[in-house]
Amino acid sequence: MARVMALKTIMESKRSREPAVRTIYKICPAPAWREAERAGVYRGSPDDARDGFIHFSTAAQLPGTLAKHYAGQSGLFLIAVNADALGAELKWEPSRGGDLFPHLYGELDPAAAETVTTLVLKADGRHLLPENLT
């Protein structure tokens, strides 16, 4: 019984470190996403392959992710995915500044996308994010 209680405490502690955020976002070049839709699977970018997981961001993390990795790039999609639909393959892990970032250790089924939005590139090289991000 003590072992079961200890395991329950560990699991509750782990869940409490996961953000309450339920929608996460993948930034993806439009041609790569269209190919994933045709193939029925998205395996990630070259950076994702190098790191061993597909990088996602929360709405709050998107401006930093775009500035650091995608400044000045046009032709990008913002793919919204329900984090709960990804199951145990989704891990929340510390990254820049200790923030927890969502990482998918597996392939993404394009059918899991709730929305796919074209990111508008402004004249200053920054992207215009949709107003309704959660």
PLM region spans:
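N-terminal amphipathic/basic-hydrophobic helices that include classical n-h-c signal peptides
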Residues: M1-P19
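Conserved, structured core segments of small domains
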Residues: K14-T134
